[in-house]
């Protein structure tokens, strides 16, 4: 099978398994997709997989690993407020409030209407 089709298959099946809360199987599919990221694949698609994998790791309470995925995604797309939000969320859960505040502030700067980021930032400020 064509490797580009295989990449898309891994991503789409990963999404399905994540939606079904089969997080370990979803992770396996996202890992397989990222193994093919050496191909000339659209960068937005690579960011999507890092985001999906990072979010799946958050559901599994693997916050440090999720941060690594969000670091990679942000390196590719530093203008995506959701990436900064989720990395900030992971930092907040790990009680790394300074890093969380920094990421959530960046998220709000990129999207001033991102109310969830504002709420989490307020929550940290009230601790």
Predicted regions and their residues:
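Alpha-helical tetratricopeptide repeat
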Residues: 1-127
């Amino acid at each position: 099978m064509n490797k580009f089709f295989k990449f898309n298959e891994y991503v789409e099946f990963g999404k399905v398994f994540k939606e079904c809360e089969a997080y370990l199987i979803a992770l396996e599919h996202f890992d397989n997709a990222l193994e093919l990221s050496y191909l000339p694949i659209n960068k937005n698609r690579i960011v999507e997989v890092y985001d999906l994998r990072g979010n799946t790791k958050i559901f599994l309470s693997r916050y440090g690993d999720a941060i690594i995925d969000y670091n990679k995604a942000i390196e590719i797309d530093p203008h995506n407020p959701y990436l900064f939000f989720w990395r900030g969320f992971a930092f907040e859960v790990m009680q790394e409030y300074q890093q969380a505040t920094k990421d959530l502030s960046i998220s709000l700067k990129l999207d001033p209407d991102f109310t969830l980021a504002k709420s989490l930032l307020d929550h940290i400020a009230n601790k």
